Amino acid sequence: MDQKRLTHLRQLEAESIHIIREVAAEFANPVMLYSIGKDSSVMLHLARKAFYPGTLPFPLLHVDTGWKFREMYAFRDRTANAYGCELLVHKNPEGVAMGINPFVHGSAKHTDIMKTEGLKQALNKYGFDAAFGGARRDEEKSRAKERIYSFRDRFHRWDPKNQRPELWRNYNGQINKGESIRVFPLSNWTEQDIWQYIWLENIDIVPLYLAAERPVLERDGMLMMVDDDRIDLQPGEVIKKRMVRFRTLGCWPLTGAVESHAQTLPEIIEEMLVSTTSERQGRMIDRDQAGSMELKKRQGYF
């Protein structure tokens, strides 16, 4: 890796660590949202660096839909145990009682009830006043215009027309009781930055990011990996083994794989350099309707 690229990554690292420390010092009860993906892994690594050799001064929170890949659950538990992190797991009890699932109820309702409402329940339950998230501005257009300190009202709603100015490195964390701030320390990172930093720092990631032969079927222009026996096969669908990997991770029925032979980090980085598509091309929740991500965020999504 050339010196300019290394310096660039260290600048991003320093900015993120500064933000994480600012939140820990400014807020009474922060939490780090942990979705188990590559961005969460980088964010957790940065947080551990920020407070080394001490432990994290806040817990990790995983909002569980019950539909993550099995490898993600195993990785989550292994990571929390290895680093001695306090891990909180919340699953929307009303959604569980209703039997909400992406095959029967669709991606929009599943996401709203199991993710958005589940997150708001957890934030209210524990009284968190700040929540770290791993979103980046290069991922999606609504995230591109969101501040690093993203103000949320007492209903956890985001108003893109009422954002606070962020001049230089001055962040406004002033809130009233019941309000909160979502904090995005990776805002200025790109997907390429994330992968190069993972390689540079030797950060452990879910194996699903690396190409391997996996059982998939084609549905709605997406390669769906069949992760358990809850699959609802439609007429004419056939499960086949194909060489695939994932650029982004979520609920397995709503996350499409991409055909790839990149089995190492350098091969993933090389693949990213020539890619012309968004990493979120395989996320079904982004296809619900025009501007669906912004609408979800207005309602309290990550």
UniProtKB/Swiss-Prot annotation:
Q: What's a Gene Ontology MF term here? A: ATP binding
- As recorded in UniProt, its EC number(s) are 2.7.7.4
Q: What does this protein do?
A: With CysN forms the ATP sulfurylase (ATPS) that catalyzes the adenylation of sulfate producing adenosine 5'-phosphosulfate (APS) and diphosphate, the first enzymatic step in sulfur assimilation pathway. APS synthesis involves the formation of a high-energy phosphoric-sulfuric acid anhydride bond driven by GTP hydrolysis by CysN coupled to ATP hydrolysis by CysD.
Q: Does the keyword Cell inner membrane apply?
A: no
Protein name, as recorded: Sulfate adenylyltransferase subunit 2
Q: Which CDD domains match?
A: Sulfate_adenylyltransferase_2
* Catalytic function, reaction form: sulfate + ATP + H(+) = adenosine 5'-phosphosulfate + diphosphate
**Source organism:** Salmonella typhimurium (strain LT2 / SGSC1412 / ATCC 700720)
Checking Pfam families in the record gives: PAPS_reduct
Spell out the NCBIfam families in the cross-references: CysD (TIGR02039), PRK05253.1 (NF003587), PRK12563.1 (NF009214)
User: In which pathway does this enzyme or protein participate?
Assistant: Sulfur metabolism; hydrogen sulfide biosynthesis; sulfite from sulfate: step 1/3
